[in-house]
């Protein structure tokens, strides 16, 4: 799950009509609230703003909404013109100006670098390792899983870079391994119940871009087979837009 989630959990309820006129934050909490993307719940990355309602999101987070014929704002559900989505330059500038303490090591980091810092902070990794074990909300006759696979972060199959979420993995591979001819195992597919950890994709980058445009965790029932899961995920993803 998003590592910045605990910092900005209430952000989707407290965004102003437009982030283009953000007031100067007075505390770390207000920084976290004002600069948290309502979709991924992490600090903004390449923020963009919807012209009609002014709501701001990470550019990559908003992309799926731009692929449908009648897009709706993910926050207020108002229709908007995809041609009137612009880079939130003022927000981007402030991300490089303001600092907030890391919730792991307390080091003050500019918000523009917060994602990278959290992904490599030993204290944060230690906290994540000590997260409570899975416990059902209500009593159940079903067996409690003892080893739930990590489907939140992945390792680059080319260079071994760790702690990459799905979007970060795609971005990392496109920027660093675009011309790598090696056949590699898709770490996202191999984490699925139906995945084959020994199958190597002949064109991994094309596979990433076409097969992993959405997050399986959001839409998929892992008890069904791969094709049914893919079709269900696509249908639900489109219906939410």
From Swiss-Prot:
Pfam families for this protein: zf-C3HC4_2, zf-Di19, zf_C2HC_14
Q: Where are the zinc fingers (RING-type)?
A: 37-77
What SUPFAM superfamilies does the database record attribute to this sequence?
RING/U-box
Task: Tell me the residue numbers annotated for binding Zn(2+).
Answer: 102, 105, 117, 121
GO BP term, pick one: protein polyubiquitination
According to its UniProt record, this protein's enzyme class is transferase
Q: Where are the zinc fingers (C2HC RNF-type)?
A: 102-121
Q: Which GO terms describe its cellular component?
A: cytoplasm
The Enzyme Commission number assigned here is 2.3.2.27
Q: Disordered: where is this region?
A: 8-30
Tell me the compartments it is located in. Cytoplasm
Recorded source organism is: Xenopus laevis (African clawed frog)
Q: Where is the UIM domain?
A: 225-241
GO MF term list: ubiquitin protein ligase activity; zinc ion binding
The protein's name is E3 ubiquitin-protein ligase RNF166
Q: What does this protein do?
A: E3 ubiquitin-protein ligase that promotes the ubiquitination of different substrates.
Keywords (alphabetical) are: Cytoplasm, Metal-binding, Transferase, Ubl conjugation pathway, Zinc, Zinc-finger
Catalytic activity as recorded in UniProt: S-ubiquitinyl-[E2 ubiquitin-conjugating enzyme]-L-cysteine + [acceptor protein]-L-lysine = [E2 ubiquitin-conjugating enzyme]-L-cysteine + N(6)-ubiquitinyl-[acceptor protein]-L-lysine
Q: In which pathway does it act?
A: Protein modification; protein ubiquitination
Organism phylogeny: Eukaryota, Metazoa, Chordata, Craniata, Vertebrata
């Amino acid at each position: 799950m998003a590592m910045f989630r605990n910092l900005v959990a209430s952000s989707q309820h407290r965004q102003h009509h437009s982030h283009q006129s953000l007031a100067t934050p007075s505390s770390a909490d207000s920084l976290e609230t004002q600069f948290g993307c309502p979709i991924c719940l992490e600090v903004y990355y390449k923020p963009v703003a919807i012209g009609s309602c002014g709501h701001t999101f990470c550019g990559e987070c908003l992309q799926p909404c731009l692929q449908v014929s009648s897009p709706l704002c993910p926050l207020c559900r108002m229709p908007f013109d995809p041609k009137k989505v612009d880079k939130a330059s003022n927000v981007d500038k402030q991300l490089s100006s303001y600092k907030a303490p890391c919730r792991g090591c307390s080091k003050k980091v500019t918000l523009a670098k917060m994602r990278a810092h959290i992904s490599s902070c030993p204290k944060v990794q230690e906290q994540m390792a000590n997260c409570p074990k899975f416990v059902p909300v209500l009593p159940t006759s079903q067996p409690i899983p003892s080893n739930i696979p990590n489907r939140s972060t992945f390792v680059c199959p080319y260079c071994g870079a760790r702690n990459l979420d799905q979007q970060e993995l795609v971005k990392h591979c496109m920027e660093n391994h675009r011309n790598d001819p090696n056949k590699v195992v898709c770490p996202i597919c191999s984490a699925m119940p139906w995945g084959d950890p020994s199958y190597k994709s002949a064109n991994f980058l094309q596979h990433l871009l076409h097969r992993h445009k959405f997050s399986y965790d959001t839409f998929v029932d892992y008890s069904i087979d791969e094709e049914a899961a893919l079709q269900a995920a696509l249908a639900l993803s489109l219906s939410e837009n």
